[in-house]
Amino acid sequence: MESIEQRVKKIVAEQLGVAEAEIKA
């Protein structure tokens, strides 16, 4: 079972990835 911290970090990483993709596009 993932801890809340791990889940938050995963979500943040995904959001940053999307932001980077949009900036580079």
Curated annotation (Swiss-Prot):
InterPro entries: PP-bd_ACP
Any one Gene Ontology cellular component term annotated for this protein: cytoplasm
Domain of life, per lineage: Bacteria
Keyword Cytoplasm: yes
GO biological process, one term: fatty acid biosynthetic process
Cellular compartment(s): Cytoplasm
Main location as per UniProt: cytoplasm
Involved pathway(s): Lipid metabolism; fatty acid biosynthesis
PTM comment, free text: 4'-phosphopantetheine is transferred from CoA to a specific serine of apo-ACP by AcpS. This modification is essential for activity because fatty acids are bound in thioester linkage to the sulfhydryl of the prosthetic group.
Domain Carrier: 2-25
Key word Membrane present: no
UniProt similarity note: Belongs to the acyl carrier protein (ACP) family.
Record function comment: Carrier of the growing fatty acid chain in fatty acid biosynthesis.
Protein name (database record): Acyl carrier protein
Species whose genome carries this gene: Alcaligenes faecalis
Gene, per the UniProt record: acpP
